[in-house]
Amino acid sequence: MPHRAASPAMSENEFDITGALFQNDSDSDNEQPSAKSKRQPPKKVPSQALDFLGDVNEDDDDDEAFIAEQQTSANRKASNLKGRTVKKGGGFQAMGLSANLLKAIARKGFSVPTPIQRKTIPVIMDDQDVVGMARTGSGKTAAFVIPMIEKLKSHSTKVGARGLILSPSRELALQTLKVVKELGRGTDLKSVLLVGGDSLEEQFAMMAGNPDIVIATPGRFLHLKVEMNLDLSSIRYVVFDEADRLFEMGFAAQLTEILHGLPANRQTLLFSATLPKSLVEFARAGLQEPTLVRLDTESKISPDLQNAFFSVKSSEKEGALLYILQEVIKMPTGPTEVSQQRKEEDASAKNWKNKKRKRAEMEKAVNMRESPTKHSTIVFAATKHHVDYLYSLLSEAGFAVSYVYGSLDQTARKIQVQNFRTGMTNILVVTDVAARGIDIPILANVINYDFPSQPKIFIHRVGRTARAGRKGWSYSLVRDADAPYLLDLQLFLGRRLVVGREFGDQVNFAEDVVTGSLPRDGLSQSCEWVTKVLDDNADLAAQRTVAAKGEKLYMRTRNSASLESAKRSKQVVSSDNWTSIHPLFQDETSNLEAEREKMLARIGGYRPPETIFEVNNRRMGKHENVDALDTIKRVRTTLESKKKRAQANEKSEFLEDASDDEKAANEAGENENEGAFSDEDDDVPTGVADNMSMASDSELEVTFSSYSQSKENKAKKASAASFQNPEYFMSYTPNNNSLVEDRAYGVHSGTNSNFAQASRSATMDLAGDDGGRGFGEARTLMRWDKRHKKYVARQNDEDGSKGTRLVRGESGAKIAASFRSGRFDAWKRGNRLGRLPRVGEAEAPNLTAGLNAAISGKRFRHRKEQAPKRADPLRGDYEKMKKKAELAKERAMSKAGGAAPRGKSELKNTDDIRIARKLKQKRREKNARPSRKK
């Protein structure tokens, strides 16, 4: 019987697959292929679904790859989305995403992809490794979540997680989980959150339930990997969110062990707002021919963000903070509108007779809509001691405050952040734990109470506001000691430095670095109030003392500013404009008020030329304190000699610099290839400005070269430029790369950011054959711990163990011995579980219950029903309890359909009958046994 002709009907997605079913365009079995024609396998297309654990069959793989490619092309058609307006030129519809994912994206509120999403999503869909950098608030989370959901598609019944997202902080991981759930609607993908502070037993149950996506922090994920002996060979999609923070020294031990267990054929993605151009610092990530996408390298921060920097003294920081909150932001005191509304609802619920159970109130609190107020402000402090102190101080001032720091309990952290998100509080005081990735809608202001020591920390802090096209403000308190860091930030951003009112009205807070002081009257009133509160409140004064001690340790361990900025900051701080009124208050103060402020500032900075001993000696004419006078004279003589030598050195250096600059300018003018820097920005030094030229995205040079800002090297480069042929000359330093920017973006910042300095400190220790000491300088293995008053091992400082016992992991790196505590084995015994399924095997249905309960949030709901207690006639509320018991009985009767409680069924099944027959037979044999008595 001949085969019927091919059906002309199109397939469901409007494309015909008969071309793949029949070779040589034959539509039926009647046509015989020619003898010369050979069977050509279809062109293999990279699979869009990460299901590599299936049966290995080449023909099936080819068919699946072809169908996946056709499905992707069909998804790109505008006709696939009926009744929707399709934007031309690179919308989400043109990326080949499925209909369910497009609906979730539209439900999320995304209409047009952001630049980072438009650049990275197609590359990720082509199974390439990506290193992506874009400014804060540009949609980097959706840039890697959308292709992950498209690749995973649906839940796999085979054991093994396929996606892994690592985040440096718990709040960022929680936020990523929320985005994954919102974009994963319409799919049955299962995702879990593994962060520190949560119950290990619950996380054991979730991991045993075979999740598809794991969102975790490195420490807790490594703990579960070692404790449960997890096999990570099934993971095909790895994301390092905020990669520059993850690859710093704090996470070195965790990442080494985690990366060792990941398969080599995985797809690796690195995302952050501050990534260096040199990828050598991420060599441990195992990138394979990555695509580097660096956007917004010139802007770095949002153009909608306006910045203000206030010069204050150390004793005025608390008063300055209160003045900014009260007068600049206009922060209201007392409870917020949301909290008042909540109290009214609670009061009405108490008056309601048939009020619901507390569980319903808890659900209502959890499901509250995130609606921060227009006054929502984040205050960044240096240490957790500062956070506690500022929380108490601002609460004393009447503000609604929340606080978060690293060592806070995880449940408390969730509650505090949720209160701020829902508008229960207006102020969130945090350390840098919340500086990365936290996306709080309608956040209006950011205050840097302690100025950051690195420019990239400043970028992440102020990036919490002015997100997704909204406006925002950042206010920073700058002391005299913080001025070098301010100049480093100004050079990094490449913006003009405006000190005081030197430029008059021509100030742009979004494009300039504008500094100045706060109005003296309001600042002095706030400082007086703080002093009064500290005198009246002993607990607050004790917290301030602890914060001062913590600040000493923080100042000792923070990174140092550049030498050029330190020299330049002395001139900036000593100028009169440093203490002048900030241009932000130009409308409020007249010129006469500005002169008054200058006079008060000069009086405040007055230093008497004589000491009290010299003044008394000159007035009284007596020589009572001869020893003190002699000591002061010797000190004064020494200081004067040092000052003269310093002035002479500065004069000689100035003359040398002027001559070197003149020579370099003359020789550089002869060379046409050397580009001259624009003179529009007088605040940026010429040498630094030459190094701040932006590089193109396609360049991927990896450089270890060190750069010196000394005048001698500049003169040598300028003199050598005469014989350099630009067509053949290859410099050992990059010409177009901004070294200032790369140093600020560096992962190992501080002293180890320079390769030359790091190479000097690198040593190779060889032990002698006889075990004796060598001739070289022996390295001290112990150091003195000032806090604990004892010697501790230096190795503990390097690996972060701080004296805890260490064991060797699979990669050879040292990990904490507490990771192998045996709690997982105890959990299995407690739940009566035997051997768990391995990677590649089918999942066990009884193990998925824990994961499903965790996803639905029903872990803590009890189902037990008990009869109410009998009312006690001797109690005063006897009638009330009696009515309550009667209502409970009526509710139980109505629940059972009005009938009496059903008894146990007496019908026997086959097993019961079989067991009963066996017992009856045993009794019969026992009764028929003859008696032993004779």
From Swiss-Prot:
Domain called Helicase C-terminal: residue spans: 361-515
Enzyme Commission numbers on file: 3.6.4.13
Alphabetized UniProt keyword annotations: ATP-binding, Helicase, Hydrolase, Nucleotide-binding, Nucleus, Ribosome biogenesis, RNA-binding, rRNA processing
Chain ranges of the Helicase ATP-binding domain: 121-293
Motif (Q motif): 90-118
Motif (DEAD box): 241-244
Biased composition (Acidic residues): 669-684
Molecular functions (GO terms): ATP binding; ATP hydrolysis activity; RNA binding; RNA helicase activity
Similarity-based family: Belongs to the DEAD box helicase family. DDX54/DBP10 subfamily.
The name this protein goes by in its record: ATP-dependent RNA helicase dbp10
Gene name as annotated: dbp10
